[in-house]
């Protein structure tokens, strides 16, 4: 990139390219409470020197990697003491007010949904620690014509943790940093920070401190397209997770723990418990469900096509023997397929009337509901949810096919999806939406969000199995074509919110649902317009993928396990923890890479896949639990100052919660990748 550097006043520098100020930076240094006055700035080629009162100075080496500017910032401290380091970044936005986007943290002012999470409604000004973002201090300012993207290298020690704040024309980074006016600590806690003192960083005389700053500033009216360009330009600067478990071992451990969660009902059928061993909050997990948060029908589909895995692995052999004895089944190569059949039969009870399916079951009371877990709205238990129905019915279609390949015909597993399809064909809204929450009589109570995209994916899998001359085939096909413009418009408008059921906010799963739907539709229709929309959904997913290894205390549980945040995904604006959803995203990113001939999505898929092979309980590292939990992998990886249940002791480097969906999603994705030959054989 052809650019020049120009000083502005005593403490600033502008980066100019093609006559445009693409970045404007100012640097400040505080000693104790005093602002050290800048003594002047000198530009020597691609090197910037900024001197401060008292002899300290900042040295910035500037290099460009094509469109990406990289500034290596080194502060030199003349005397011992406590310092605060600040810099600001802006650009010539022609006085236009910018939209602010912070990856995995701030999207469209966080005005979608309800909850305690930070939003413009609560305050117009915020400061966040770098560990809350998928790239440290990552932010984008965009005015409809221009996008300024920037981030920093991660802190290597607690005293260097930075925070970032902004206004509509620029951003300020402070080292060390603090959060204000509130700190979001859990789903129900937004802690006031009024009484805190500004932190400082102690430096010895003649010592140095170095951080890197990354900037991509470009003419672009598409915010997410520009951010993706930023990530691509920085790929060589990013970390890759360290692999600690082979793919063969991953499959063995996942299957072992999944089988340990299987129980038998009084009728002899099988179900999957939601989670175990979760201490003071275990009561929250006394459920089972065919779909969301348990994914039991998807687990059945995985069992139905699982090859005979044991490799002499004693914990798995023990679980197979337990299943064989519990259900009086031969312990042979059909054991898991027969178990899958018993599981499929169990969840058929969720059909309350023809096509009306409520698959969440309270194991203590036996009550069935649309969703019985944690949520902002207890009335969900009385309703029917399109995400739950779409997930479960797609899995029933796949389960039916997988069992049929083994000579096991379970007609009920296809008949139920057909009745549910009829329900949604009849209820589909005039704009093409499949809605979100429905009454048992088919009346919509909530139509917001992306839950209906799961019905779209379900229809894509059901359609090829229907008689092309049948009325249902015609209706499903027609409903599908009416849905595509509606959900395509959600992508175009960036309406990625309201997908997860245990919170109400912008979330990554909204984009995952839309990506899957449009890839499924593209597989049916081979229409490039559908692929273009899938790519746009994928761009939003990229914003939730951690690209660098955030700071973790070496003394924390995550630090002791040498956990890497790179390649992990965070959940939503309302959930500030990391999870292992990346295995499922990887399956779709590999599809997207194949369809679009873009290897970037393939590389990103493998980054997520490798990240998901860590923090799995083994005999040597049981993750704080006993032998019966071999293979468990926590749902909540609390890398920052947040914990689902507001428990301070489990923030900043802790992990918690055994929940079925983590194992189901990971194992099913593992089998899919294995079947596709996408798992490197030497790992």
Predicted feature locations:
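Beta-strand/loop-rich accessory regions of lumenal/periplasmic or secreted enzymes
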Residues: 28-55, 60-205
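Extended, well-ordered alpha-helical scaffold segments
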Residues: 226-261, 312-350, 405-427, 469-488, ...
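Active-site lining segments of carbohydrate-active enzymes
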Residues: 370-383, 394-474, 523, 535-545
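Low-complexity, Ser/Thr/Pro/Gly-enriched N-terminal "stalk/linker" regions
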Residues: 203, 221-292, 318-321, 325-326, ...
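Well-ordered alpha-helical scaffold segments within catalytic/enzyme domains
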Residues: 297-334, 391-409, 454-472, 513-528, ...
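Non-catalytic carbohydrate-binding regions of carbohydrate-active enzymes
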Residues: 471, 480-502, 525, 529-655, ...
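Carbohydrate-binding/catalytic loop surfaces
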Residues: 267-289, 357-386, 433-454, 494-519, ...
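Short Pro-Gly-centered flexible turn/kink motifs
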Residues: 199-224
């Amino acid at each position: 990139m052809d650019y020049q550097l120009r000083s502005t006043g005593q403490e600033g520098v502008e980066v100019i390219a093609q006559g445009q100020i693409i970045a404007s930076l100012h640097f400040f240094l505080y000693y104790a409470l005093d602002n050290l006055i800048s003594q002047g700035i000198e530009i020597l080629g691609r090197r910037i020197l900024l001197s401060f009162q008292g002899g300290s100075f900042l040295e910035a080496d500037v290099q460009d990697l094509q469109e990406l500017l990289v500034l290596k910032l080194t502060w030199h401290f003349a005397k011992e003491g406590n310092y605060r380091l600040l810099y600001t970044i802006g650009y010539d936005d022609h006085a236009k007010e910018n939209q602010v986007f912070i990856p995995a943290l701030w999207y469209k002012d966080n005005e979608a949904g309800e909850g305690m999470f930070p939003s413009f409604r609560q305050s117009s000004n915020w400061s966040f620690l770098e560990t809350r973002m998928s790239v440290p201090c990552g932010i984008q300012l965009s005015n409809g014509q221009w996008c300024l993207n920037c981030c920093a290298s991660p802190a290597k020690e607690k005293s260097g943790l930075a925070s970032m704040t902004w206004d509509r024309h620029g951003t300020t980074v402070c080292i060390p940093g603090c959060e204000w006016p509130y700190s979001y600590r859990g789903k129900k806690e937004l802690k006031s920070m009024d009484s805190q003192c500004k932190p400082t960083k102690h430096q010895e005389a003649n010592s140095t401190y170095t951080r890197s700053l990354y900037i991509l500033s470009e003419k672009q009216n598409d915010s997410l397209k520009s951010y993706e360009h930023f990530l691509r330009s920085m790929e060589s600067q990013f970390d890759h997770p360290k692999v600690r478990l082979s793919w063969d071992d991953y499959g063995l451990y996942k299957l072992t723990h999944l089988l340990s969660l299987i129980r038998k009902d009084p009728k002899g059928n099988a179900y999957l418990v939601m989670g175990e061993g979760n201490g003071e909050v275990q009561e929250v997990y006394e459920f089972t469900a065919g779909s969301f948060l348990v994914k039991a029908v998807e687990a059945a589909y995985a069992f139905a096509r699982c090859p005979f895995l044991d490799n002499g692995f004693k914990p798995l052999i023990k679980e197979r023997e337990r299943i064989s004895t519990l259900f009086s089944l031969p312990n042979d190569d059909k054991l898991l397929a027969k178990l899958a059949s018993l599981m499929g039969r169990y969840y058929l009870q969720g059909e309350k009337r023809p096509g009306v399916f409520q698959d969440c079951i309270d194991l203590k009371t036996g009550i069935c509901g649309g969703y019985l877990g944690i949520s902002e709205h207890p009335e969900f238990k009385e309703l029917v949810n399109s995400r739950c129905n779409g997930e479960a019915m797609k899995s029933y279609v796949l389960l039916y096919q997988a069992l049929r390949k083994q000579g096991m015909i379970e007609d009920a597993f296809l008949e139920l999806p057909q009745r549910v399809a009829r329900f949604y064909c009849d209820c589909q809204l005039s704009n093409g939406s499949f809605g979100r929450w429905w009454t048992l009589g088919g009346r919509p109570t909530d139509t917001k969000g992306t839950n209906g995209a799961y019905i779209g994916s379900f229809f894509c899998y059901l359609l090829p199995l229907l008689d092309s001359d049948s009325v249902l085939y015609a209706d499903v096909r027609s409903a599908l074509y009416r849905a595509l413009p509606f959900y395509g418009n959600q992508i175009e408008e960036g309406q990625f919110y309201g997908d997860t059921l245990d919170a109400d906010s912008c979330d990554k799963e909204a984009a995952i649902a839309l990506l899957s739907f449009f890839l499924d539709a593209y597989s049916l229709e081979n229409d490039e317009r559908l692929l273009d929309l899938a790519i746009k959904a994928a761009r939003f997913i990229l914003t939730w993928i951690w690209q660098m290894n955030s700071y973790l205390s070496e003394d924390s549980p995550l630090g002791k396990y040498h956990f890497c945040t790179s390649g992990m995904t965070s959940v939503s604006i309302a959930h500030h923890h990391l999870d292992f959803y990346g295995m499922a995203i990887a399956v779709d990113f590999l599809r997207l890479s194949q369809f679009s001939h873009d290897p970037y999505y393939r590389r990103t898929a493998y980054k997520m896949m490798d990240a998901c092979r860590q923090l799995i309980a083994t005999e040597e590292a049981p993750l704080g639990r006993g032998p019966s939990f071999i293979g468990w992998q926590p749902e909540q990886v609390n890398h920052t100052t947040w914990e689902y249940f507001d428990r301070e002791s489990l923030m900043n480097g802790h992990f918690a919660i055994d929940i079925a969906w983590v194992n189901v999603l990971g194992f099913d994705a593992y089998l899919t990748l294995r079947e596709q030959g996408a798992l490197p054989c030497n790992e």
